[in-house]
């Protein structure tokens, strides 16, 4: 549940004011699902004196809920921060999803900027699907990428 996730997240981040005061901080995480932990962590970093907070995410944005393993553990698409941003932009969380999954599209750029703005991040960058596949070392057809691009074949 969300309460337990929040508790675990707080135990993972123990800020040190002497190290953060007036500094530009780069914070890395594996993914952003709902954004709940991100909001709290960014606030803590600023509260402890960070001048800038930059975020780098190891995987591409989660655009689609996982129908296979429940990886995102979402009860619905609107739990995903990406879908909430898409709904704000388009008025429909299901509109033009393939454009929001394409890193070179204006829709993708706008969605990422909205997430950064929502959480007060100085900058936000996600790993690309292409770079992730390259790092894994298998052909894309052997890796499930459904939650990133909606493709379900592997």
Question: What are these language model-derived features?
Answer:
Residues 1-154:
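PRPP-associated nucleotide enzymes
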